[in-house]
């Protein structure tokens, strides 16, 4: 099925991104013979359209910066792919899809070093700007703690549409594969993420961010919980 033929309300929703489609098709190619691939992809497309017809319509469509590559709607498409192909796709392959969407932008920023005050302050400003943009849409409810030189950056989401979607439609089990990319992205900036909970397994998604040389990192060792989430003690 052509993307243009997909029956979704484009006045309030957006289509999955081209990079997302490419990643999903690559996984379908990995697991299915050629004669089945088109039909499997169409199942994913139809599931996407079906669930969007039951989903909230206030996320801003193309106007909302969260709806681009690797964002809310790509996460929804990835969950639909998981729903159709869960019998063959692995957890690691699901992680790879989101990593391949998110990490290229961070790889371009390898020169950033959060251990240095200049970059740490610049990152903080980026988060405060993001909060203002979140406040305009009330999709991801974001709160950034005031900056302190001697402490890690801290912010949290108390609402996350991707998590909300996962819980509503029964995909909470695969959310760790989508959330874990936050750790990998920070590592590319000489930073570390310290997290204890997410909007799926708790009431918030917390982000404590410091340089990879900060003693705070050793004080909060990372582990994977029984559901596959990367977390910290």
Report each predicted region and the residues it spans.
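Short, cationic low-complexity segments
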Residues: 184, 222-233
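Short, well-structured alpha-helical interface segments that form or flank functional binding sites
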Residues: 76, 80, 181, 202
């Amino acid at each position: 099925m052509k993307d243009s033929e997909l029956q979704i309300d484009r006045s309030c929703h957006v289509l999955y991104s081209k990079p997302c489609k490419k990643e999903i098709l690559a996984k379908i190619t990995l697991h299915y013979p050629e004669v089945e691939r088109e039909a499997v992809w169409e199942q994913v497309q139809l599931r996407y359209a079906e669930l969007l017809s039951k989903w909230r319509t206030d996320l801003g469509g193309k106007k909302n910066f969260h709806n681009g590559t690797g964002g809310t709607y790509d996460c929804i498409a990835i969950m639909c792919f998981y729903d159709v192909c869960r019998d063959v796709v692995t957890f690691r392959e699901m992680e790879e899809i989101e990593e391949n969407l998110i990490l290229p932008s961070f790889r371009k920023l390898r020169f950033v070093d959060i251990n240095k005050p200049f970059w740490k302050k610049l990152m903080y400003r980026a988060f405060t700007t993001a909060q203002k943009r979140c406040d305009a849409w009330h999709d991801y409810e974001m709160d950034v703690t005031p900056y302190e030189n001697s402490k890690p950056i801290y912010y949290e989401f108390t609402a996350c549409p991707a998590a909300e979607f996962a819980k509503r439609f029964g995909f909470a089990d695969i959310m760790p594969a989508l959330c874990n990319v936050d750790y990998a992205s920070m590592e590319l900036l000489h930073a570390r993420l310290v997290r204890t909970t997410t909007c799926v397994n708790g009431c918030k998604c917390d982000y404590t961010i410091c340089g990879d040389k900060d003693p705070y990192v050793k004080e909060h060792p990372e582990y994977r919980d029984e559901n596959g989430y990367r977390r910290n003690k």
